[in-house]
Amino acid sequence: MDSDDLQVFQNELICCICVNYFIDPVTIDCGHSFCRPCLCLCSEEGRAPMRCPSCRKISEKPNFNTNVVLKKLSSLARQTRPQNINSSDNICVLHEETKELFCEADKRLLCGPCSESPEHMAHSHSPIGWAAEECREKLIKEMDYLWEINQETRNNLNQETRTFHSLKDYVSVRKRIITIQYQKMPIFLDEEEQRHLQALEREAEELFQQLQDSQVRMTQHLERMKDMYRELWETCHVPDVELLQDVRNVSARTDLAQMQKPQPVNPELTSWCITGVLDMLNNFRVDSALSTEMIPCYISLSEDVRYVIFGDDHLSAPTDPQGVDSFAVWGAQAFTSGKHYWEVDVTLSSNWILGVCQDSRTADANFVIDSDERFFLISSKRSNHYSLSTNSPPLIQYVQRPLGQVGVFLDYDNGSVSFFDVSKGSLIYGFPPSSFSSPLRPFFCFGCT
């Protein structure tokens, strides 16, 4: 291969973004190839949907596999390029020979005689070009790790923003349901109601401030991550000798980035005790509200759609990270009028659905949770985070998850369903009044985990 052909070949191994030999190259949908870090930095600058920097076509796939062949060729091209290893700084003072070897144990450049000395004889040594490529591989892994932290922080920041707006809406809803519940009480509790509303307002303001502070911390952390990522990326492109002399503290920096990663706020409001509420509810208590017959089922609590599958169908349910093998228990009777109250122990499971729904107990009556004539309080656990919500429409409940008995109150004639934390004597949530058109039966579904 003559020099012109060699130059053409080498040009095919150069990323058009950073104008350096490819490092961790990926080939996107249109067929053009780039360094993965270059694409990451482009996407971080807001170029979404991602367009090819060469032909401007939109790339549908967010993640790409490394082009292994291109990676190997680029590595070979780097190792064959001229290296300024004969500079005075790279001459061994003791033996006056060029340092052409790298000691992995001591992270030092050595000349031949030094590598054979008693101090280094037992260590592993490799040529500078090969060692530099190994170092770049380690840098790429550290960059991948940094990018994971970056993406996790960005997701947390987006979630924090959604939580801020969601909490604002929830506080307004909670004020209304507290006021409605006090209006139902047989005794006048105006002062207690005002204390609860004022306490709710104070707690909410504190949580809003925490969420705003958290968003600032996450934004600052993202900027630090981006700077660190870019710094490592630039380090990958420095000459081999300089690279090997600057490799010591990379892991320490990325470990520090992980330790300094801001954690999202988990907002939780206090549900205050309402004087006499349990005494009032117990006037309508239903004994043995739930049947003793348990039906195997599968519950999915994903963000897209929440559903329950009964009988053998649950064995073929699609794989779902938020799916839980469960058991369902229906009420012993359906209600068509009157007021009814019962309590259910939720101690044994983190994932459960409790409430009332249309009277449909056949094994093939699979249903979507967020649909009409279903009024549920839902507890779910994802990773180490517990969430409490209601359905129709889906609404996160920013109050502490009940750990013992949960009370369910159905006022059929007035079209209302409410949930209470029995241990606290407090209101969890009350659905807005509606008009029921069919018999309603108690329902409880609890996960096996």
Curated annotation (Swiss-Prot):
Domain B30.2/SPRY: from-to ranges: 269-449
Keyword Metal-binding set for record: yes
A GO CC annotation given for this chain: cytoplasm
Binding-site list for Zn(2+): C92, H95, C114, H120
Coiled-coil residue windows: 189-225
Listed GO MF terms: ubiquitin protein ligase activity; zinc ion binding
CDD domains tied to this protein: Bbox2_TRIM43-like (cd19783), RING-HC_TRIM43-like_C-IV (cd16603)
Listed Pfam families: SPRY, zf-B_box, zf-C3HC4
Segments forming B box-type zinc fingers: 87-128
PROSITE patterns per the UniProt record, alphabetical: B302_SPRY (PS50188), ZF_BBOX (PS50119), ZF_RING_1 (PS00518), ZF_RING_2 (PS50089)
Keywords, sorted A to Z: Coiled coil, Metal-binding, Zinc, Zinc-finger
Zinc finger residue ranges, RING-type: 15-56
Gene Ontology BP terms: innate immune response; regulation of gene expression
Family according to the record: Belongs to the TRIM/RBCC family.
The protein, known as: Tripartite motif-containing protein 64
Biological source species: Homo sapiens (Human)
